[in-house]
Structure formats: C-alpha cells, structure tokens
C-alpha cells in the first residue's frame, strides 16, 4: 500500500486542519526494568512451569500499522483511528 508522506488533516491540538507529516512507528525493545517485567522475572524464578497458559489459536500473519501524524505548526503527533493490517507499506511523495 502506498501512503502519502504529508497529509492535510485535523489537528486536535491546534483545533484546525493543517499539514501533517506521516511517521511509521517501529516497535521498541521491551524495557527490562519496568515494574511488570520485574514482577514477571520474579514469578519465573524457582521450580514450576511457565506462569501463564499457552495462547489459544494462532498468531495473525501481519501486524497492525502504527502511524503517527505530526503537525507542522505545533509539532505534536497524534494517531488517527486504529491501525490497519497491510503486508507492504510504503510512504511516497504526493
């Protein structure tokens, strides 16, 4: 899917329509020092199996896109609706 690099859309911070730069956000590495991760490591210690049941069903073949729209006037970024699934994604001029 080809998507424009710049798009004119509503900015909830400026409260008007402005030009936005489209950014694709990549997944960052999990923080090992977060409270949830520390709790999980504590549960994994010692004897016994994995503390959670195996997930039911299968994993989806494609992850959902995370697009951020950054306003050129105020510089703040926001999302627009939920992400959508697409195999190939490309940002193009226009």
UniProtKB/Swiss-Prot annotation:
Which Gene3D superfamilies does this chain map to? 3.10.450.80
User: What is any one GO biological process for this UniProt entry?
Assistant: translation
Which keywords describe this protein according to UniProt? Answer: Metal-binding, Ribonucleoprotein, Ribosomal protein, RNA-binding, rRNA-binding, Zinc, Zinc-finger
Read off the InterPro entries from this record. Ribosomal_eL44 (IPR000552), Ribosomal_LSU_eL42 (IPR053708), Ribosomal_zn-bd (IPR011332)
**How many cofactor units bind, and how?**
Binds 1 zinc ion per subunit.
Q: Where does Zn(2+) bind?
A: 11, 14, 71, 74
An example Gene Ontology cellular component term from the record?
A: ribosome
Where are the C4-type Zn fingers located?
Answer: 11-74
Annotated GO MF terms: large ribosomal subunit rRNA binding; structural constituent of ribosome; zinc ion binding
Cystine pairs annotated here are none
Q: What cofactor is this protein dependent on? A: Zn(2+)
Tell me where on the tree of life, at the top rank, the source sits: Archaea
Similarity section: Belongs to the eukaryotic ribosomal protein eL42 family.
Its job: Binds to the 23S rRNA.
Oligomeric state and interaction partners are given as:
Part of the 50S ribosomal subunit.
Q: What is this protein identified as? A: Large ribosomal subunit protein eL42
- Provide the species name: Pyrococcus furiosus (strain ATCC 43587 / DSM 3638 / JCM 8422 / Vc1)
Q: What is the lineage of its organism?
A: Archaea, Methanobacteriati, Methanobacteriota, Thermococci, Thermococcales
């Amino acid at each position: 899917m080809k998507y424009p690099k710049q798009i004119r859309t509503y900015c909830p911070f400026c409260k008007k329509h402005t030009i936005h730069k489209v950014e694709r956000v990549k997944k960052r590495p999990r923080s090992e020092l977060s409270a949830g991760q520390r709790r999980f490591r504590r549960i994994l210690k010692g004897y016994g199996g994995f503390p959670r049941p195996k997930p039911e069903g299968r994993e989806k073949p494609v992850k959902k896109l995370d697009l951020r729209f950054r306003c050129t006037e105020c510089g703040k970024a926001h999302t627009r609706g939920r992400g959508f699934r697409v195999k190939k994604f490309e940002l193009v001029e226009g």
